[in-house]
A protein has these predicted regions:
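Terminal, membrane-proximal amphipathic helices
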Residues: 1-33, 45-160
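C-terminal helical "lid" subdomain and adjoining coupling/linker elements of P-loop NTPases
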Residues: 39-40
Length: 160
């Protein structure tokens, strides 16, 4: 039987996740200079989905944990926030919510040199901001599950 995760372990997982944010943000920046229209959006969506799966796995927020956590009314809003945006549709809604910033990143990259630099910086910033928000949501859900004596199995490993 699984034991409750110690708060120190959850904080260590969160710090480990923060260290990996840079990798995803750099990939987002590199994708920002992708010259093929439409492909950059698909790559950004795939990158977000991969990052979310990695972060959830580290906190032990698997599909089995999701089913278990959805039975607790106090956790349902946070469970929806963590799991419902972790779909292609959820990521597309998120990218659209960036609206003007995402459109600006997409169009400015066609300006030689300077535009590509601006697009890369915007891609880095957007991915970094999103990743940090998602880590906090996963951390909060794992802490709330712990506070309510709900056991989940944290893998505490990186998904390649």
């Amino acid at each position: 039987m699984a034991e409750l995760m110690h708060l120190g372990k959850l904080e260590a997982i969160r710090e480990d996740c923060y260290k990996s944010v840079n990798r995803y943000a750099i990939l987002g920046a590199a994708n920002a200079i992708n010259p093929i229209p439409g492909l950059d959006i698909s790559v950004d969506a795939g990158l977000c989905l991969r990052m979310m799966a990695d972060m959830r796995a580290r906190f032990g927020l698997s599909k089995e944990a999701e089913e278990k956590l959805r039975h607790y009314d106090v956790l349902v809003p946070l469970v929806k926030k963590v799991f419902d945006f972790a779909t292609k549709q959820g990521v597309m809604i998120l990218l659209k919510s960036f609206g003007k910033r995402y459109l600006g990143k997409t169009t400015v990259k066609y300006v030689p040199f300077i535009g590509q630099g601006i697009a890369a910086a915007a891609g880095y910033g957007m991915m970094r901001w999103f990743a940090r928000q998602y880590i906090e949501d996963c951390y909060e859900l794992a802490c709330r599950a712990r506070d309510n004596a709900i056991t989940i199995e944290a893998e505490a490993k990186v998904v390649p």
